[in-house]
Amino acid sequence: MILIEHILGNVKKDPVWRERLKGATFDFLVLDQREAQKSRCRKSSTQGLDLGISLDRNVVLADGDVLSWDEKTNVAVIVQINLRDVMVIDLRELKKRSADELIKTCFELGHALGNQHWKAVTKNNEVYVPLTVATTMMDSVMRTHGFQHLPFRFAKGAEILPLLSNSEARLLFGGAEESDTHVHVASPLDEPHGSGLHVHAIHSHGHSHSHDHDHDHNHDHDHKHKQ
């Protein structure tokens, strides 16, 4: 087993390593986002190298990290993380609006995203949100909360990654799937107990929540908890 205790650099973020490894042969350590959050793990590379990852606890792997480089053979072991797609919300339209409207919209957008427990990074007048549910669900959240005037699209994680710093990339893509899927889709124009879509996934504390929404204004919930 080859022990990896330090990250040498990042071929996608560091111009020095990008130049240094130009023409090198890459042996990839392929990880999903959950695996990338572990500071300690053992896994084989695509070329069969048995790698033991033992990093400091506050260090997580990012796509493009260089784990080892053999100058004689010109072979580098590179981390490849399968990135999620990203919802990109364009905030530039808000610059045309009054300061009061801009503040109100940004506050409401932040509240809506936070209410879903969605990670987000704001940069270059855009908000990047990694997908944790279907695009149709995220589309519904945006539209039913009244953000139709904000252009948004869905992009590949690999398209967004070069726009981010290392810390931003780790925040956006690090363990996005571990966040609770906690989706509420209900129009603010609906009646207080109007029909809406409420999806609660299994939370990290081990409970699952199932709500039977037959509202007759008694607000009865059939709660089923798995201990």
From Swiss-Prot:
Keyword DNA repair: no
Matching InterPro entries: UreE, UreE_N, UreE_N_sf
Keyword Repeat (UniProt): no
Principal location listed in the UniProt entry: cytoplasm
Database matches in CDD domains: UreE
Lineage: superkingdom: Bacteria
Gene Ontology biological process terms in this record: protein folding
Pfam families in the cross-refs: UreE_N (PF02814)
MF term (GO), any: nickel cation binding
A cellular-component GO term for this protein: cytoplasm
UniProt biased composition (Basic and acidic residues): 209-221
Sorted UniProt keywords: Chaperone, Cytoplasm, Nickel, Nickel insertion
Compartments in which it is found: Cytoplasm
Chain intervals for the UniProt region annotation (Disordered): 192-227
Similarity comment: Belongs to the UreE family.
Role according to the record: Involved in urease metallocenter assembly. Binds nickel. Probably functions as a nickel donor during metallocenter assembly.
Protein name as it appears in the record: Urease accessory protein UreE
Species per Swiss-Prot/TrEMBL record: Yersinia bercovieri
Lineage, highest ranks first: Bacteria, Pseudomonadati, Pseudomonadota, Gammaproteobacteria, Enterobacterales
Gene assigned in the entry: ureE
